[in-house]
């Protein structure tokens, strides 16, 4: 058996190539030098003398053995096995010497944490080493587990965002990354890892720094998308349920559904479906917000179609109870036929119109929409026109509404815009509440003067009760209080004047001072407060006027008028003598 085959049996291919290369490159290496470092028992091999004819052959064999041993020992001591790519680095005339140098370098202690940049030839040997490959394999496994966890966390979010795939590609992982087809920023590329010049610790720190920086940037985006989708889905579900419960006709359902979807998508409005005659469940009404009940349950005069929502939790304020501008004639029936009532789904919210000799609650629609109830009525947007306050400079009563006037009025919207408060609701209310004024008119002044016959010191709450058609604010309330202050001032001036006149006439007994209807004092007061003389002054006012005159007479006769505050006791007496105001003054149309 050939000894070369025995020596080359552990690594037959690589070692044979390297042995042949070293045999061709080094013919002059000395065997005794190699024998000192050789671990193999070369002494057991029989040696030949130079005089032996086979000496040259034995010397050749020993040299080859020494070189092969050196190469094998260098391969065992090197960190990475030789590969065909860097085999040329080991094939050189100085192969044994470099192997010994590598052996000495391996014995030196080197720090494990910080790896100094090695020469180019050493990097080529270290990249493919078993330790580096093992660490790369572990790193890939960790990244693969992390990727699986992220994919498992992202799958429920993708399914929750709906079958439309709204969240696909927007979460932490895109569709390509989820399927493994696209580029993955956290997967280490083998070619890139082999070609880089960084050490292993730097690569691990870089990978660990990339993991937490990627997740927070994608998580808020996916949460925001999920939140928006859930909000939209809940809004659509609530709208559909309200429409099915509160609305019967399919035509109005389609119309209101479109308006609800358009306004809920903007996120600035709130749906408030009409509850006129279509609501059959009282529990659904109790669950509605208060502003919806106020809009839907405002009674309009004595009309039978204006159905009240009797809810003890949400009482309607008295100032929100309007009165019609003028009572309809006696020959006008206050009920509508059944076929009209069937088409009046939005009667409470969309106002009233005069149609076919009846006061009905149907919204203003053209003839085609009335013939086809399922078709969508041509509703004009309510923001295009704004109802102007009915401030009439020379008239005592607002003009009666006609059918043409009603057609030009805006309709109440299906939703109430938030952050506008009561002012926006008053502006949008239809026919029945369009009398609510932003300011005061001469009709209000006339009513206030007539109310002075009954009360001289009215409170703000009393004014709100008897002026239901006025939108009260701080300015209007102070203006009305100022009116009554002027009324009292004129009243007390006339009383003081008459008392001094009686003293100058020689009257000594205050009981003789009585205000009669034919007296000069009464004529002056009646001309000021009842200019048209179309109101009968009550007898209680004559009694209060007589008492006031007597009090002024006593104060002036006693000389108390020298005190700057001598009138205050008289004011206290008169303020306690207010009488009840008739109920007719609560009507917004009184006086005509």
From Swiss-Prot:
Coiled coil: none annotated. GO terms for molecular function: DNA-binding transcription factor activity, RNA polymerase II-specific; RNA polymerase II cis-regulatory region sequence-specific DNA binding. Pfam families: HPD. Keywords: DNA-binding, Homeobox, Nucleus, Transcription, Transcription regulation. It is found in: Nucleus. Residues 360-377 have a biased composition (Low complexity). Residues 437-495 form the Prospero-type homeo domain. Residues 201-211 have a biased composition (Basic and acidic residues). GO terms for cellular component: chromatin; nucleus. Residues 95-106 have a biased composition (Basic residues). Residues 496-592 form the Prospero domain. Residues 20-56, 85-129, 155-218, 308-336, 353-382 are annotated as: Disordered. Residues 437-592 are annotated as: Homeo-Prospero. GO terms for biological process: cell development; nervous system development; regulation of transcription by RNA polymerase II. Residues 314-331 have a biased composition (Pro residues). The Prospero-type homeodomain and the adjacent Prospero domain act as a single structural unit, the Homeo-Prospero domain. Belongs to the Prospero homeodomain family. Transcription regulator. Does not seem to be essential for embryonic development and postnatal survival. This is Prospero homeobox protein 2. It comes from Homo sapiens. The lineage of its organism: Eukaryota, Metazoa, Chordata, Craniata, Vertebrata.
């Amino acid at each position: 058996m050939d000894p070369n085959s025995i020596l080359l049996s552990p690594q037959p291919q690589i070692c044979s190539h390297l042995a042949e290369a070293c045999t061709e490159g080094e013919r002059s290496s000395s065997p005794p030098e190699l024998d000192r470092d050789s671990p193999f028992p070369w002494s057991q091999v029989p040696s030949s003398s130079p005089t032996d004819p086979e000496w040259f052959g034995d010397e050749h064999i020993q040299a080859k053995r020494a070189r092969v041993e050196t190469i094998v020992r260098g391969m065992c001591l090197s960190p990475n096995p030789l590969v065909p790519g860097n085999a040329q680095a080991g094939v050189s005339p100085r192969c044994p010497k470099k192997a010994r140098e590598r052996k000495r370098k391996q014995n030196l202690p080197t720090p494990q944490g910080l790896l100094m940049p090695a020469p180019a030839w050493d990097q080529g040997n270290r990249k493919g080493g078993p330790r580096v490959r093992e660490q790369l394999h572990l790193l890939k496994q960790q990244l693969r587990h992390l990727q699986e966890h992220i994919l498992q966390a992202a799958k429920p979010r993708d399914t929750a965002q709906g079958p439309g795939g709204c969240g696909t590609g927007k979460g932490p992982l895109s569709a390509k990354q989820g399927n493994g087809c696209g580029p993955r920023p956290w997967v280490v590329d083998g070619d890139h890892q082999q070609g880089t010049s960084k050490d292993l610790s730097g690569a691990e720190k870089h990978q660990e720094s990339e993991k937490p920086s990627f997740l927070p940037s994608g998580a808020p985006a996916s949460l925001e998308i999920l939140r928006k989708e859930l909000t939209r889905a809940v809004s659509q579900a609530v709208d559909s349920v309200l429409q099915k419960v509160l609305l019967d006709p399919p035509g109005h359902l389609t119309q209101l559904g479109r308006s609800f979807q358009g306004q809920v998508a903007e996120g600035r409005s709130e749906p408030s479906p009409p509850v006129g005659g279509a609501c059959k469940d009282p529990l659904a009404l109790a669950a509605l917000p208060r502003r919806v009940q106020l809009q839907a349950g405002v009674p309009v005069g004595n009309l039978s179609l204006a159905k009240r929502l009797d809810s003890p939790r949400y009482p309607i304020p008295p100032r929100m109870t309007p009165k019609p501008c003028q009572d309809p004639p006696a020959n006008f029936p206050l009920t509508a036929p059944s076929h009209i009532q069937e088409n009046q789904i939005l009667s409470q919210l969309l106002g009233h119109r005069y149609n076919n000799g009846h006061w009905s609650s149907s919204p203003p629609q053209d003839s085609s929409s009335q013939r086809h109830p399922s078709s969508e009525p041509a509703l004009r947007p309510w923001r295009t026109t704004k109802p102007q306050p009915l401030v009439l400079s020379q008239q005592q009563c607002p003009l009666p509404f006609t059918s043409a006037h009603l057609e030009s009025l805006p309709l109440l919207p299906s939703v109430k815009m938030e952050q506008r408060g009561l002012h926006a609701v008053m502006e949008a209310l239809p026919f029945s509440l369009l009398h609510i004024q932003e300011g005061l008119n001469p009709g209000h002044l006339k009513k206030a003067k007539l109310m002075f016959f009954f009360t001289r010191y009215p409170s703000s709450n009393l004014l709100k009760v008897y002026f239901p058609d006025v939108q009260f604010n701080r300015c209007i309330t102070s203006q009305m209080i100022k009116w009554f202050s002027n009324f009292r001032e004129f009243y007390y001036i006339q009383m003081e004047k008459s008392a001094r006149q009686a003293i100058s006439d020689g009257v000594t007994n205050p009981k003789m001072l009585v205000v009669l209807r034919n007296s000069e004092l009464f004529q002056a007061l009646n001309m000021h407060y009842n200019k048209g003389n179309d109101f009968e002054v009550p007898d209680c006012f004559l009694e209060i006027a007589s008492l006031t005159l007597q009090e002024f007479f006593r104060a002036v006769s006693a000389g108390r008028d020298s005190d700057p505050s001598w009138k205050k006791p008289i004011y206290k007496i008169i303020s306690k003598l207010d009488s009840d105001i008739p109920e007719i003054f609560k009507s917004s149309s009184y006086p005509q």
